[in-house]
Amino acid sequence: MLIDEAAEASSHISGMKLYLIVLSLLLAVFCVALDNTILSVAIPRITDEFHRLNDIGWYASAYLLTTCAFQLLYGKLYALFSTKWVFLVALCIFEVGSLICGVAPSSVVLIVGRAIAGVGSSGIFTGALVTIAHIVPLAKRPVYMGLLGGMYGIASVAGPLLGGAFTNEVTWRWCFYINLPVGGVTAVVILFLLRIPKSADLRTHGAWEMLKGLDPLGTIVFTPSIICVLLALQWGGVDYAWSNGRIIALFVLFGVLLITFIIIQVLMKDKATVPIKVASQRSVACASVFVFFIGASMFVMIYYVPIWFQAIRNQSPVQAGIDSIALILANTAGAIISGAVTNKTGHYAPWFIVSSVIMSIGAGCLTLFTVDIAQSKWIGFLFLYGIGVGFGFQQGAVAVQAVLPMAQVPIGTALIWFVQMLGGALFTSVAQNIFSTHLAENLANLQLPGLDPEAIVGAGATGFRQLVQPEYMDQVLVAYNAALLDVFQVALICSCLSILGAVGIEWRSVKQNR
């Protein structure tokens, strides 16, 4: 085995040492999740400074591309090498990327920094879950995973709020500088307090021999395949028509590389980046389906609910973040409640179904938003959706750790987190295309004199008001709201489809031996 099962119990800790390590992991996860959304508010100031409007899309996609592309590689690294040192290296890369972004003298340097930060971030959340697996007994892990899931949700929704505060009060560069002291605290705690015994294989063969088990061919094929599909979805229908040769070539290349990667995984067997016996294990496969769709639904809502507040209710990004607190609180409460109850009962499988059902009902309610909806309704709808997501957000990782031997937990955990991120990345791009297309169509159908649909689409969630004559504003808001509801319907469909994975989860208990 790659990880010595006999050493698992010896690495469990408790008391103040455990709390400090968990707190440091929460801080690291907070920074990683914050980076997904914090920049959205700062982009106008960045473009004012660098004068590169065409680079706006890359500020987010550079981070997202590398975050997704390196997920599975980190799973293999955590399986082969010291969890402590792999995590610290990932954190260091993330910090270097954040520093480059903070001091960036040009738009190109900022994009490079975002890409480097993404490489580091792809190993941090997985590393936090793997660390919990090492230091906490299986029966007690759900509540700690719930805390990590809750923190990720808090940071994702709070990003625009903090980004607005930094941009308005100091400088947009603090959107990145904030990661440095927080990451530094995490690094110090992990460096001095975390002690995980070396795996039997690492003690026997050494680091150089273990490097041969990294499946370099699989990584070389897999990484560009993910970049190709994400670029195709990022550009398709926005920068280039779907029929454009560039988009078609990217999709074809993605398909060829993905098929090649699967063949390599089959041939490599246990040495593969994702061994087939891990990916095909019933709970792992079903959890992957579940988290793909819950990730898709959640990220679509995280990005577009604040846009609804800004566009329809004419709120600032900061106020939109404040009004999204119902979603934050519900998500956090759901994650902690499900983790605590699972700790008590041992059963995690019911939460998959509960999450899918409540999340779907909440998403359905969000598709009922109107321009003049009452505050009590949108607060209740956001809370219902948020608690549904919270119930299931971390359950995939719990299921994987319950059914896989410790040697395969890092790979299974990385797979789950990769699929969850991929679902969010893919459907956020799909939602963007649907929103832009439907908004332009809705505005064109109004046939209002002097109204330029393309200009309004490009003006953003608040800037469009300056392009609309007051007497036409009510009609434009209805058209804008309808386009956003089409996006919410994408999240609703994904929420409903998550049940396909939920019903297949094996009914096991974290209180039983694997």
Swiss-Prot record:
The keyword Transmembrane applies. The chain crosses the membrane at residues 13-33, 61-81, 85-105, 116-136, 146-166, 174-194, 218-238, 247-267, 289-309, 321-341, 351-371, 378-398, 411-431, 485-505. One of its GO terms (molecular function) is transmembrane transporter activity. One of its GO terms (cellular component) is plasma membrane. It comes from the Eukaryota. Pfam families: MFS_1. Keywords: Cell membrane, Glycoprotein, Membrane, Transmembrane, Transmembrane helix, Transport. It is a multi-pass membrane protein. Induction: Expression is not regulated by the aflatoxin pathway aflR activator or aflS coactivator but by the fadA-dependent signaling pathway. InterPro entries: MFS, MFS_dom, MFS_trans_sf. Signal peptide: none annotated. It is found in: Cell membrane. PROSITE patterns: MFS (PS50850). Glycans are attached at residue 343. Disruption phenotype: Does not affect aflatoxin secretion. The keyword Cell membrane applies. Efflux pump; part of the gene cluster that mediates the biosynthesis of aflatoxins. Belongs to the major facilitator superfamily. TCR/Tet family. This is Efflux pump aflT. It comes from Aspergillus parasiticus (strain ATCC 56775 / NRRL 5862 / SRRC 143 / SU-1). The lineage of its organism: Eukaryota, Fungi, Dikarya, Ascomycota, Pezizomycotina. The gene is aflT.
